[in-house]
Amino acid sequence: FDNEGHLFVTMGDRSSAQFRDRAQDLDSHIGTIVRINPDGSIPDDNPFVGQGDALPEIWAYGVRNVQAAALHPETGALWEIEHGPRGGDELNIIEPGANYGWPVVTFGVEYSGGTIGEGISSAPGMIDPIYQWTPVIAPSGMTFYAGDIFEEWQGNLFVGGLASTALVRLELDGNR
């Protein structure tokens, strides 16, 4: 829940080549992050409210397989991490109405080694991740440090890694 009480829900692409292209379609929940009120209604200020060809609950789209999300303790911005395929795990700051590119752009490749999408990692109109891991760490959770014991870690982001069996600390400089 954000500071205004809205609930964010992430919807992946089911890790399926059959469904992945739907992450670019605003009439599908696949590959999206939705924002709703606690009673299930749609906030009036969601970016696609009133756009006839889009589901109004969609907050952002073009994500692959979100594994964790957290609100930045100072800015309230929604951050998320997602599994890439073979390479290209991502850390993103989610903006309303933004397209994060999956599967058109990715730093990863098919598990078979083939190209995904257009074989590019950036494109106009699509938001680049603020950080990506290749090889993958298979992120499994994240939190911003707000404790008192390690003052120099204040605001740092901690990410668990399944494949790396590691806890990764990212020292942030603003949104980087």
Model-derived regions: residue spans:
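Beta-propeller domain segments
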Residues: 4, 13-176
